[in-house]
Structures are given as C-alpha cells and as structure tokens.
Amino acid sequence: MQPNDITFFQRFQDDILAGRKTITIRDESESHFKTGDVLRVGRFEDDGYFCTIEVTATSTVTLDTLTEKHAGQENMTLPELKKVIADIYPGQIQFYVIEFKCL
C-alpha cells in the first residue's frame, strides 16, 4: 500500500470531496509541494486514504494577509480561518497556500 503524501483533519474530508475546500494552508515543513504535483490524500487521524489531488498553484501568505477569498476557498469565514490557522500553528506567521483540485 502506498503512503499518503499529505493529510487533512477528518472534519475537512467531505468539503474536499465536494469541491468546497480547494486550498490548504501549511507551515514551512510542507512548503515543498509544486504546481502539477499529484498527491495521495489521507486523514490525519488514521492516515486512511480518501482521494487524490493535483496541486494547481502555490503561494505564500501571512495571518495578516489572509483574505475573504482564502476563507471562501477553505469553506470558512475569515475569522474562522484565522483561528484555525492560529490553533494549528501557534506563534507562526509565514504560511504556504496550496491550491488543489480532486482528481
């Protein structure tokens, strides 16, 4: 069985599969993904595979430069998105946006 290339919290699985979540915001440890990469996606909690995505774009962002567009791509409000990012990556400022589509 192949390992997963990237994981998401299980609570995001349905939004990813339905196309409501089309970006992920990660820290430097996951800044290596490039446009065109095809990734196996698993759940963070159990590493269970649930889809394959293609990276369509990458960019950098800070908490202060997050926009309503980012929030919409995450299927959240901007305050929700800022809180989620701050909770997952406390004390960090620089992040990497990975835009994707399900294959």
UniProtKB/Swiss-Prot annotation:
- Please give the superkingdom of this protein's source: Bacteria
Please write the reaction equations for the catalytic activity of this protein.
N(4)-acetylcytidine + H2O = cytidine + acetate + H(+); N(4)-acetyl-2'-deoxycytidine + H2O = 2'-deoxycytidine + acetate + H(+); N(4)-acetylcytosine + H2O = cytosine + acetate + H(+)
Q: Which family does it belong to?
A: Belongs to the N(4)-acetylcytidine amidohydrolase family.
State the taxonomy lineage: Bacteria, Pseudomonadati, Pseudomonadota, Gammaproteobacteria, Enterobacterales
Gene Ontology MF annotations: hydrolase activity, acting on carbon-nitrogen (but not peptide) bonds, in linear amidines; N4-acetylcytidine amidohydrolase activity
GO cellular component, as recorded: cytosol
- What EC class is this? hydrolase
SMART domains xrefs: ASCH
What name does this protein carry?
N(4)-acetylcytidine amidohydrolase
EC number(s)?
A: 3.5.1.135
Domain spans labelled ASCH:
6-101
- Alphabetical UniProt keywords: Hydrolase
Q: Which residues form the active site?
A: 21 (proton acceptor), 24 (nucleophile), 74 (proton donor)
What functional role does this protein have? Catalyzes the hydrolysis of N(4)-acetylcytidine (ac4C).
